Curated annotation (Swiss-Prot):
Residues 19-210, 211-403, 404-602 form the Albumin domain. This is Alpha-fetoprotein. GO terms for cellular component: cytoplasm; extracellular space. GO terms for molecular function: metal ion binding. GO terms for biological process: apoptotic process; homeostasis of number of cells; immune response; ovulation from ovarian follicle; progesterone metabolic process. The gene is AFP. It comes from Bos taurus. Sulfated.
Length: 610
């Protein structure tokens, strides 16, 4: 499962102090420089992405005009020492272009943002981005004859329009990913236009691109939401874990350097600073390739690729390198005789970063949240042992207990895969449906179905892997699914239990949701017979439509009585299945449902006490 779609990202530049830090708190030099220039980059494409993501409802013509106007400013010589293409604050210039005339802000509901200045204006525009606005129609279907003709007449215009269509539908998607996908699209158009069956060629090729877009967009939303909710400290811990697993042979100083810059790049990406993120990502990738001898043997082929976009994609998806030889299996007595509680806040953070590095490079196949749970447990252990009479003995005993975090996740993975093998994907989804309707009955039926479909699909993917990969796969997918449930909660609060799980601790989100049982604050709606009356149309549908109808019934039932026991549920489902079988075999199907249905509803209400 992809965790970080790219180390290189978006394109606005230099929002006030974004380039001022070239060393971290421990004096480690940054790989990045402070050049605010845009020479050699696809500024038209980047500016199109920015305006389409910031003003999602704008037409292509409106976006193109804003691009033209702002590039005139950027590419004009300033008269200072900076050459054309250099601008100290490109973010401000781009936002000013949107706000320059009243027509665009008023037309698209951005007047409030334009009434603000500086970072407040920037934050307002970011808050207006919507993942799936109802005002934007579905992605236009590619019609081979028209598309091939348009591409041949003006290739640059055709591709830039494609960039616009992607960006407005995916407002948090990193610009380099959009440019990379547009580059893939640019390659398949001439190929498919010459194909014997152009329609089939386009359908096949575009499907894979669409899948990549969807996954990347969801991932970028997740990353930015985690950074926004839990702050830079948590995000740096995530990055330490991931980079240490990717490059376990690298020393701690090298990891610190990469973590500092990668975290900075993601921060700029999530702000929408496209040019800086794009250029900084290229610099980081170039640096990684220049240091491959000390970082990883797995990236040699990646570093031979012709473009930075291809190179970056390859490095991110490369296998983690092998652990160094002679590395002890455990991180025992990490602090030696030092008293953790006597350390300064800075030294505590540094010590925990080093522990996370050492633990991650020894456990390159564990999911990031599991390692962070171990690190959190280790810090709690150190704090507790500092108060004991024999800190060293306390620490030795406590380190064995850290395995419980791995064992809990292993037990869950084993149990989930056991259910998948026993039930199959559809019935596994039904089990998740019951559980999550109890945890979050405020979610709509489509939301519950979509959520649990992803969970069941994760079982289908992860449970077919080798046992040593199932755990990381399952935890990784669960982290993303729960992350998007938390984004939904942020937009429209669900209930106190969900809020507690989403906000208290990033690393503990999945265990928190696993421990939720029933939302005790939920008050079921008055019972409605209409939700439980069946008609003969149920006898005429098959496959997915029939499964969906049954799942809707299941959701309605649990929402009516969230405390329903497994035995009660099995009885009610069996009774209604019997009704379906009886009436669908009857010559008078509708009459059967009309006569038998109400009696069964009464029986069910009495049994459940609703």
């Amino acid at each position: 499962m992809k965790w970080v779609v790219s180390f290189f990202l978006l394109f606005l530049l230099n929002f006030s102090d974004s380039r001022t830090m070239h060393k971290n708190a421990y004096g480690i030099d940054s790989i990045l420089d402070s050049s605010p220039c845009s020479s050699g980059t696809n500024l038209v494409g980047l500016a199109t992405i920015f305006f389409a993501q910031s003003v999602q409802g704008a037409t292509y013509e409106e976006v193109s005009q804003m691009v033209k106007d702002v590039l005139t400013i950027i590419e004009k010589p300033t008269g200072s020492k900076q050459p054309a293409g250099c601008l100290e604050n490109q973010v401000s210039a781009f936002l000013e272009e949107i706000c320059r005339e009243k027509e665009i802000p008023e037309k698209y509901g951005l007047s409030d943002c334009c009434s603000r200045t500086g970072e407040e204006r920037h934050d307002c525009f970011l808050a207006h981005k919507k993942a799936a606005p109802a005002s934007i129609p579905p992605f236009p279907v590619l019609e081979p004859v028209t598309s091939c003709k348009s591409y041949k007449e003006n290739r640059e215009l055709f591709i830039n329009r494609y960039i616009y269509e992607i960006a407005r539908r995916h407002p948090v998607l990193y610009a380099p990913t959009i440019l990379s996908v547009a580059n893939q699209y640019n390659k398949i158009i001439p190929h498919c236009c010459k194909a014997e069956n152009a329609t089939e060629c386009f359908e096949t090729k575009v499907t894979s691109i669409t899948k990549e877009l969807r996954e990347s967009s969801l991932l970028n939303q997740h990353i930015c939401a985690v950074m926004g909710k839990f702050g830079p400290r948590t995000f740096r811990a995530i990055t330490v874990t991931k980079v240490s697993q990717k490059f376990p042979k690298a020393n701690f100083t090298e990891i610190q350097k990469l973590v500092m810059d990668v975290a900075h790049i993601h921060e700029e990406c999530c702000k929408g600073n496209v040019l800086e993120c794009l250029q900084d990502g290229e610099r980081v990738m170039s640096y990684i390739c220049s240091q491959q001898d000390i970082l990883s043997r797995q990236i040699a082929e990646c570093c031979k690729l012709p473009t930075t976009l291809e190179l970056g994609h390859c490095i991110i998806h490369a296998e983690n390198d092998d652990k160094p030889e002679g590395l002890s299996p455990n991180v025992n007595r990490f602090l030696g005789d030092r008293d953790f509680n006597q350390l300064s806040s800075r030294d505590k953070d540094l010590s925990m970063a080093r522990f996370t590095y050492e633990y991650s490079r020894r456990h390159t196949k564990l999911a990031v949240p599991i390692i962070l749970r171990v690190a959190k447990g280790y810090q709690e252990l150190l704090e507790k042992c500092s108060q004991s009479e024999n800190p060293s003995e306390c620490q030795d005993k406590g380190e064995e207990e850290l395995e419980k975090y791995i064992q809990e996740s292993q037990a869950l993975a084993k149990r989930s895969c056991g259910l998948f093998q026993k039930l199959g994907e559809y019935y596994l989804q039904n089990a998740f449906l019951v559980a999550y309707t109890k945890k979050a009955p405020q979610l709509t039926s489509p939301e519950l179905m979509a959520l649990t479909r992803k969970m069941a699909n994760a079982g289908a993917i992860c449970c077919h892997l080798s046992e040593d990969k199932q755990l990381a796969c399952g935890e990784g997918v669960a982290d993303l699914i729960i992350g998007h449930l938390c984004i939904r909660h942020e937009e429209n609060p669900i209930n106190p239990g969900v809020d507690q799980c989403c906000t208290s601790s990033y690393s503990n989100r999945r265990p928190c949701f696993s421990s939720l049982v029933v939302d005790e604050t939920y008050v079921p709606p008055p019972f409605s017979d209409d939700k439980f009356i069946f008609h003969k149309d149920l006898c005429q549908v098959q496959g997915v439509p029939l499964q969906t109808m049954k799942q809707q019934f299941l959701i309605n039932l649990v929402k009516q009585k969230p405390q329903i026991t497994e035995e009660q549920l099995e009885t009610v489902v069996a009774d209604f299945s019997g009704l379906l079988e009886k009436c669908c075999q009857s010559q008078e199907q509708e009459v059967c449902f009309t006569e038998e249905g109400p009696a069964l509803i009464s029986k069910t209400r009495a049994a459940l006490g609703v």
